[in-house]
Amino acid sequence: MSSGTPSLGKRNKTPTHIRCRRCGRKAFNVKKGYCAACGFGRSRRLRKYRWSKKWKKKKNVH
C-alpha cells in the first residue's frame, strides 16, 4: 500500500476524538492519549489559558 492519497481513506474508520473522562467533552485524542480541552492524560492540572477566558465568559452568558 502506498503512503499517499489512497491510504488517507483508511483514516475514517476509528474516531480521532472520543469523550473525555474528566471534562466530558468530545476532545480526547485516541492516538495521542490526551484531551485537547482539559489536558487529561498529559498533566494532572486542568488545562487553562488566559486567552481562553473571554470565550468561556461569552459562552456562559447565553
Curated annotation (Swiss-Prot):
Annotated zinc fingers (C4-type), start-end: 20-38
Annotated GO biological process: translation
One Gene Ontology term, aspect cellular component: cytosolic large ribosomal subunit
Any matching Pfam family: Ribosomal_L37e
Keyword GTP-binding among record annotations: no
Highest taxon in the source lineage: Archaea
Chain residues that bind Zn(2+): C20, C23, C35, C38
A Gene Ontology molecular function term of the record: structural constituent of ribosome
Cofactor(s) named in the record: Zn(2+)
PROSITE patterns recorded: RIBOSOMAL_L37E
UniProtKB keywords: Metal-binding, Ribonucleoprotein, Ribosomal protein, RNA-binding, rRNA-binding, Zinc, Zinc-finger
Annotated cofactor note: Binds 1 zinc ion per subunit.
Family under the similarity heading: Belongs to the eukaryotic ribosomal protein eL37 family.
Function: Binds to the 23S rRNA.
PANTHER family for the chain: 60S RIBOSOMAL PROTEIN L37, RIBOSOMAL PROTEIN L37
Name assigned to this protein: Large ribosomal subunit protein eL37
Organism: Pyrococcus abyssi (strain GE5 / Orsay)
UniProt gene name: rpl37e
